[in-house]
Amino acid sequence: MSSALRSRARSASLGTTTQGWDPPPLRRPSRARRRQWMREAAQAAAQAAVQAAQAAAAQVAQAHVDEDEVVDLMTDEAGGGVTTLTTLSSVSTTTVLGHATFSACVRSDVMRDGEKEDAASDKENQRRPVVPSTSSRGSAASGDGYHGLRCRETSAMWSFEYDRDGDVTSVRRALFTGGSDPSDSVSGVRGGRKRPLRPPLVSLARTPLCRRRVGGVDAVLEENDVELRAESQDSAVASGPGRVPQPLSGSSGEESATAVEADSTSHDDVHCTCSNDQIITTSIRGLTCDPRMFLRLTHPELCELSISYLLVYVPKEDDFCHKICYAVDMSDESYRLGQGSFGEVWPLDRYRVVKVARKHSETVLTVWMSGLIRTRAAGEQQQPPSLVGTGVHRGLLTATGCCLLHNVTVHRRFHTDMFHHDQWKLACIDSYRRAFCTLADAIKFLNHQCRVCHFDITPMNVLIDVNPHNPSEIVRAALCDYSLSEPYPDYNERCVAVFQETGTARRIPNCSHRLRECYHPAFRPMPLQKLLICDPHARFPVAGLRRYCMSELSALGNVLGFCLMRLLDRRGLDEVRMGTEALLFKHAGAACRALENGKLTHCSDACLLILAAQMSYGACLLGEHGAALVSHTLRFVEAKMSSCRVRAFRRFYHECSQTMLHEYVRKNVERLLATSDGLYLYNAFRRTTSIICEEDLDGDCRQLFPE
């Protein structure tokens, strides 16, 4: 289930050091680098002009001394000589003023528009040399750290970037100590006119998360009046349970900060927004948000006030961290309910769990999906009384709360998931049919009404509640984990989450549809598996929007086959896990590791062997009805693959077919087909296994898991 996301700035433990430090400067694109070279050239020219003016002034001073000596020696001669000296002195003075004027002109060009000083300051600058700023991005008019913040405009958004460590420190020290703004001297008067004052806006520039360990326990630092919220894309929850990221430290200006890896690919996500009680100005062009919307919300909710954007407002209670984040017991790893590549799940109480994500992008996507599902499901059908207030809508699990500071989302607690469910009996086949019908309805709703593709349909992501008096009976099922979910292409650049906690708006990444990042390798639909085997760089074949839903239902069919094997194999669950499932997952781990290491050819080879195990599953459960599946797959491999890969495929298929024999399930299949619910599930599995090529994705999704 790994996802090759873009590299983000990560944080690491501060260790035993006590000295605070600031993050290194971000790398700039070539356009910004060219502008910087122009500034440096202008500053060098200005400095050279000033040095020339100083040298000329020294010559004039020496000329005055020589003039006095000459006048003393020539008191008896005619006044023509004195006139000559006076003329030379005038020429020298004119030269000095000319150099000074050139220096002022160069300095004015370097300064931004509207920041030229008045005539009095120009005269003052003529009498002192211009000291070039030590900051590579600072304004030439001032070397103060305040000008270490500059606006950078990209194709996606606007942002503020830090210049160097000293600039960041000076800015934060001024904020925390209540120091005056270095631009206040010219803020009221600019160009000889007073500027109208505007309401105060709070700058919420992204800063790294800070941590500090005191005696083995996290020390929660009090926040200052100026809330510089940490919104790092890769705050490392992965460093272990019980480690809580902390806000900025006190007014001394020293910070406990973690190491940050600067990567140019993260620049598109660096942003700065400003907000007050009436408006939230975002870094997304043409988008402003109303913070008063949060007053009536208790959960993330979609507010379709604009036709251009899908805005999900994410509220946060004032005591959320006290009641949720600090209430989670992470002292014992045995309490942990689940762990994956995207985060960890810990119990909060009897009815709720907390998901601690490894990346902020995971949390942002989760709450945006939650708000979208909750709002779209509200107008579809009434929620069952047992699910009111639980965050489960149309068979989809949603988050009921969120904290960006600690990267936490709150969800309803279920008994277990389908992968860990170990009580399977034919007597409860009616409950299994209800569960898979609920999941199929959830997938259709997600694709048709929400226009989002889940891309991670696995037994591990299907949460279930069982009857405590009959553990084999599934009472309730819900689909969860939207880590790999992507909106449809027509939603690109439109999906935004607005957070009350930080007063910021975060855009949801556009769809990429790389097949190697879609689905778990063992449950990937067969048409997509074949495309990935032929081309590791392949993307989802978007020839029509109905292909998304067909692909999702095909993946659900693979999950159904996984559960039917547990239900029908007469050898028992333990034998299925050690034999059949071990072969299915044998190469899935290798595919994920190869994908993480960027070895796409190795990932493709592993997926080829997984295809053999998937084919064996279908042949075992369907018997003679699976002959078409086997023959079509073998012809595809022989036509598309090299001889060595064909031999490897045949060897592994032979190994799987020796373990997955139809004789092990034949009698139980007959008993299954004797019931209407069993016949429904068996036919649903047959229809999904018939989706074996790209053209089959153009079918009618209503024929799969019909109502």
Curated annotation (Swiss-Prot):
<feature type="compositionally biased region" description="Low complexity">
    <location>
        <begin position="178"/>
        <end position="188"/>
    </location>
</feature>
<dbReference type="GO" id="GO:0016032">
    <property type="term" value="P:viral process"/>
</dbReference>
<feature type="compositionally biased region" description="Low complexity">
    <location>
        <begin position="1"/>
        <end position="14"/>
    </location>
</feature>
<dbReference type="GO" id="GO:0044071">
    <property type="term" value="P:symbiont-mediated perturbation of host cell cycle progression"/>
</dbReference>
<dbReference type="InterPro" id="IPR010615">
    <property type="entry name" value="Herpes_UL97"/>
</dbReference>
<feature type="active site" description="Proton acceptor">
    <location>
        <position position="456"/>
    </location>
</feature>
<dbReference type="GO" id="GO:0019033">
    <property type="term" value="C:viral tegument"/>
</dbReference>
<dbReference type="GO" id="GO:0004674">
    <property type="term" value="F:protein serine/threonine kinase activity"/>
</dbReference>
<keyword id="KW-1121">Modulation of host cell cycle by virus</keyword>
<keyword id="KW-0945">Host-virus interaction</keyword>
<keyword id="KW-0418">Kinase</keyword>
<comment type="subunit">
    <text>Interacts with UL83.</text>
</comment>
<comment type="function">
    <text>Serine/threonine protein kinase that plays important roles in several processes including nuclear viral egress, viral replication or regulation of host cell cycle progression. Participates in the acquisition of tegument during virion morphogenesis in the nucleus. Redistributes the host nuclear lamina by phosphorylating cellular Lamins-A/C. Plays a role in viral DNA synthesis by phosphorylating the DNA polymerase processivity factor UL44. Stimulates host cell cycle to support viral DNA synthesis by phosphorylating host retinoblastoma/RB1 protein.</text>
</comment>
<feature type="region of interest" description="Disordered">
    <location>
        <begin position="113"/>
        <end position="147"/>
    </location>
</feature>
<feature type="region of interest" description="Disordered">
    <location>
        <begin position="1"/>
        <end position="32"/>
    </location>
</feature>
<comment type="similarity">
    <text>Belongs to the protein kinase superfamily. Tyr protein kinase family. HCMV ganciclovir subfamily.</text>
</comment>
<feature type="compositionally biased region" description="Basic and acidic residues">
    <location>
        <begin position="113"/>
        <end position="127"/>
    </location>
</feature>
<protein>
    <recommendedName>
        <fullName>Serine/threonine protein kinase UL97</fullName>
        <ecNumber>2.7.11.1</ecNumber>
    </recommendedName>
</protein>
<feature type="region of interest" description="Disordered">
    <location>
        <begin position="176"/>
        <end position="199"/>
    </location>
</feature>
<keyword id="KW-0723">Serine/threonine-protein kinase</keyword>
<keyword id="KW-0946">Virion</keyword>
<dbReference type="GO" id="GO:0005524">
    <property type="term" value="F:ATP binding"/>
</dbReference>
<dbReference type="Pfam" id="PF06734">
    <property type="entry name" value="UL97"/>
</dbReference>
<dbReference type="InterPro" id="IPR011009">
    <property type="entry name" value="Kinase-like_dom_sf"/>
</dbReference>
<keyword id="KW-0808">Transferase</keyword>
<dbReference type="InterPro" id="IPR008266">
    <property type="entry name" value="Tyr_kinase_AS"/>
</dbReference>
<dbReference type="GO" id="GO:0106310">
    <property type="term" value="F:protein serine kinase activity"/>
</dbReference>
<feature type="region of interest" description="Disordered">
    <location>
        <begin position="231"/>
        <end position="264"/>
    </location>
</feature>
